[in-house]
Amino acid sequence: MVLETIGRRSGQKRATPVLYLREGNSLVVLAANAGADRTPAWWLNLREAGSGEVIVGRRRIRVTPRLLTGGERDRVWWAFVEMYPQAEHYTRFTNRELPLIALEPAGT
């Protein structure tokens, strides 16, 4: 999937390929940055803008981000790791909690 955001400093459109897990009506993405201590720019941009667009196959969908927390995050984390085991490996490289973000269709 490709996530499109607007750069918080540049104002330019940015496109980033991201892995996703389908969870109900949401597409869940992991802001891992391969385990780096820095939060990925796409998440900073999306959080500041409050919305973005994703391209899944031939569909373009306007989305709003929602940071997963608590028990919901824990449950979805293990589903994400099952889909992409490398995600668990990333936690060894950083002290930050890797954000899991539900991208929800705008207007729902």
Predicted regions and their residues:
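Short loop segments at secondary-structure junctions
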Residues: 24-25, 106-108
